[in-house]
């Protein structure tokens, strides 16, 4: 799924002889995306540690769509220790200039979990310690948009431009489309920005209606929708 959590592995520490590997598998986010109402002073994201023994150092920050750290957001606490079998809440505060009021704005929430190290267990060993980076979408959503997020996928327009499928999104929402097909031909998942269009190469022999699903605010797939190819 295009909008599932992106996970990256970072090599943090290498020591001496035999090899052990540790991974931060106990940390989980409470959502696959964050919706931040623009009129709200803040929003939140739950983080849980399901591990019965492991502690993790958790570092959180927000990036813009270009992958640069976004200084207009404050995440508190930006750095904390997650104890075994515990839950914590990150507060996310936007402190920048007003964002566009006629459409959503996209950012990326990053949460890196680094497992603790017992030095007595690794002395004289070669240890490869892995951190897990969870990266999910953060949408800043203005109030009083003309459509609901549930209705937005029904407004999409599809047309053929040469050997490409053109998708037009007139709505105010970012839309993630998955399980796309033209007739019997499958097409890669895409995300299309508000009030924009994009073109996707069509597989050879693609004919017929367009069928797709979208991802809702809770990270779940909507029912399949079929649209004519204009």
Curated annotation (Swiss-Prot):
GO biological process: cell wall organization; chaperone-mediated protein folding
UniProt entry tagged with the keyword Transcription: no
Alphabetized UniProt keyword annotations: Chaperone, Fimbrium biogenesis, Immunoglobulin domain, Periplasm, Signal
Keyword DNA repair found: no
Signal peptide start-end: 1-23
InterPro entries reported in the protein's UniProt record: Ig-like_fold (IPR013783), PapD-like_sf (IPR008962), Periplasmic_pilus_chap (IPR050643), Pili_assmbl_chap_C_dom_sf (IPR036316), Pili_assmbl_chaperone_bac (IPR001829), Pili_assmbl_chaperone_C (IPR016148), Pili_assmbl_chaperone_CS (IPR018046), Pili_assmbl_chaperone_N (IPR016147)
Primary location class: periplasm
A cellular component term, taken from the record's GO annotations: outer membrane-bounded periplasmic space
Pfam families, sorted: PapD_C, PapD_N
Protein location: Periplasm
A single MF term (Gene Ontology): protein folding chaperone
Sequence similarity: Belongs to the periplasmic pilus chaperone family.
NCBIfam families in UniProt: PRK15195.1 (NF011742)
Its biological purpose: Required for the biogenesis of type 1 fimbriae. Binds and interact with FimH.
Protein's UniProt name: Chaperone protein FimC
Organism from which the protein derives: Salmonella typhimurium (strain LT2 / SGSC1412 / ATCC 700720)
């Amino acid at each position: 799924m295009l909008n599932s959590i992106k996970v990256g592995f970072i090599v943090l520490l290498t020591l001496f002889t035999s090899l052990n590997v540790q991974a931060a598998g106990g940390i989980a986010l409470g959502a696959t995306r964050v919706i931040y109402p623009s009129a709200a002073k803040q929003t939140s994201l739950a983080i849980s540690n399901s591990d019965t023994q492991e502690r993790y150092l958790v570092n959180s920050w927000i990036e813009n769509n270009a992958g640069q750290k976004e200084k207009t957001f404050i995440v508190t606490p930006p750095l904390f220790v997650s104890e075994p079998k515990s839950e914590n809440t990150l507060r996310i505060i936007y402190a920048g200039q007003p964002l566009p009021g006629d459409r959503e704005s996209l950012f990326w929430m990053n949460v890196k979990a680094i497992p603790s190290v017992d030095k007595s267990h690794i002395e004289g060993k070669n240890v490869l310690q892995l951190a897990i980076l969870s990266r999910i979408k953060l949408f800043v959503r203005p109030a009083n948009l003309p459509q609901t997020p549930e209705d937005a996928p029904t407004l999409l327009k599809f047309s053929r431009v040469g050997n490409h499928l053109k998708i037009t999104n007139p709505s105010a929402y970012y839309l993630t489309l998955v399980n796309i097909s033209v007739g019997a031909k499958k097409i890669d998942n895409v995300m299309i920005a508000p009030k924009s269009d994009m073109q996707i190469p069509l597989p050879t022999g693609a004919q017929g209606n367009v069928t797709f699903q979208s991802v809702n605010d809770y990270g779940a797939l909507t029912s399949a929708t079929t649209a004519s190819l204009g």
